[in-house]
């Protein structure tokens, strides 16, 4: 494995080899740059330049995508092994108190250009340009000796057409050193921690406050004893006591105080009420109703006798058919006008005949 060969991942598809060369420009001499489908390899001349590229470009945005920069490991990159060994071979940039303030910077000077110039005096660990104040920058060195060397040798150095001024920062020794994540370059702000990471690591909430509370609760009511004792008590005693005491006490007043007096006191009163109420009318068991029901029914008449004499089929209808017709004759004679004298003898003769006929019918009846 070469310490000067770097792997670059998550490269946008529209990026070209010239774009990669311009992106890493200012970090020493680039010997080779190979661009493939979504990743590539960059080889520099000096191992220190390779280390700076890893520290400064890891997670940096390139043409709309955050790239991954790691030391190359053959044809395949092994990120797990890199994380274990990168701390020793490629330590992250550290913030020190050996800081110089650079003034009169050109607008075209970047932090990469400033860092390349400061390497002439020593090993810069952190550089920044135009971040807080336009036209000013900051440089930190790993040792105080490198800082003193840069202050004496590079003060007045011309960078992109302007001579810069270097002076020591008096407040650098009193400021606390910020913690910089290893994934990002030193001049970038630290990444925000996620609540999920604190939750997985077991923060104060879970370890100190919440879990002891659960342990205390479980210490009073273990899971096994709760199932063995409480549930058994509920099944054996608790449930039986509830049924025997609560529900039986609830039903006992109805059985002892309400229902029993109802059978002994209320029903006799109800009988007395009925007897007093029935005084005004005969009861079902009085003598009048017994005599009425014991009386023999009236004799049944024959249907033939009850029929009308004019009803066809009756005995009276067949016995005197002529009598009924003759009885209607005088009625018809009364409706007629008065007869003449020649007809009166005949009418008297008929009357005699009718009288004899009526007498005969009466005798037969």
UniProtKB/Swiss-Prot annotation:
GO terms for biological process: mRNA processing; nuclear mRNA surveillance; RNA splicing. Extensively phosphorylated on serine residues in the RS domain. It comes from Schizosaccharomyces pombe (strain 972 / ATCC 24843) (Fission yeast). Disulfide bonds: none annotated. This is Pre-mRNA-splicing factor srp2. Residues 184-194 have a biased composition (Basic residues). Residues 166-365 are annotated as: Disordered. CDD domains: RRM2_SRSF1_4_like.
